[in-house]
Amino acid sequence: MTPRLRLQPESVGIGMTSQRVRDRLVERLREAGIQDESTLNAMRTVPRHLFIDEALASRAYEDTALPIGHGQTISQPWVVARMTEAVLQVAPTKVLEVGTGSGYQGAILAALGLEVYTVERIGDLLRQARKRFRHLGMNVRSKHDDGRIGWPEHGPYDAIVVTAAAPALVDALIDQLAVGGRLVAPVGGASSQSLVQLTRGADGAIEQQVLAPVTFVPLLSGMLD
């Protein structure tokens, strides 16, 4: 699967945002257990430095979460790659992302040619993410709303990626998962969280698996402009 996006000259990057630096990040991800080549190619291609403040650009290709304002973060690249790899295993076409944030996770999914729907409760973050999607020529459908509700009008989804942690998986989101689909989400409180994958079998039965310990911001209700 070849990543699809339009790269402007400033997207290519120089110095600490150069292709060489991105390649080193991909090798670190590979060494850390990410095996799916489509995921690794998308991580190599999508310019993470465009999804953070310019002052932090020199750290864009470190394998660490970084602040994006409003008490939110852009996720650690390994976590983005692991979540992407997990949902690609069910060969999805249509994906729901809960928590647009900077737009980086959604951009990775869109670069893989998936039909992406993303919901963000913080209006300012969503406006910035939309500009980035347009800049990269990505057709990502986005909505300013309470992410815990999902986007049922366009469901069911082959895959659902949740980028903030709740004490338990949210029933309203599980209800929007198609038969054969997979939901990946962090579950837990401030002191302990796990990345959980939930798969709905052909018979409708639900199977859960814990993938890794993680740390995410909390999944909150309501909306902010």
From Swiss-Prot:
Keywords: Cytoplasm, Methyltransferase, S-adenosyl-L-methionine, Transferase. GO terms for molecular function: protein-L-isoaspartate (D-aspartate) O-methyltransferase activity. It is an enzyme of class 2 (transferase). InterPro entries: PCMT, SAM-dependent_MTases_sf. The keyword Cytoplasm applies. It catalyses: [protein]-L-isoaspartate + S-adenosyl-L-methionine = [protein]-L-isoaspartate alpha-methyl ester + S-adenosyl-L-homocysteine. GO terms for biological process: methylation; protein modification process; protein repair. GO terms for cellular component: cytoplasm. PANTHER family: PROTEIN-L-ISOASPARTATE O-METHYLTRANSFERASE, PROTEIN-L-ISOASPARTATE(D-ASPARTATE) O-METHYLTRANSFERASE. Catalyzes the methyl esterification of L-isoaspartyl residues in peptides and proteins that result from spontaneous decomposition of normal L-aspartyl and L-asparaginyl residues. It plays a role in the repair and/or degradation of damaged proteins. Belongs to the methyltransferase superfamily. L-isoaspartyl/D-aspartyl protein methyltransferase family. This is Protein-L-isoaspartate O-methyltransferase. The gene is pcm.
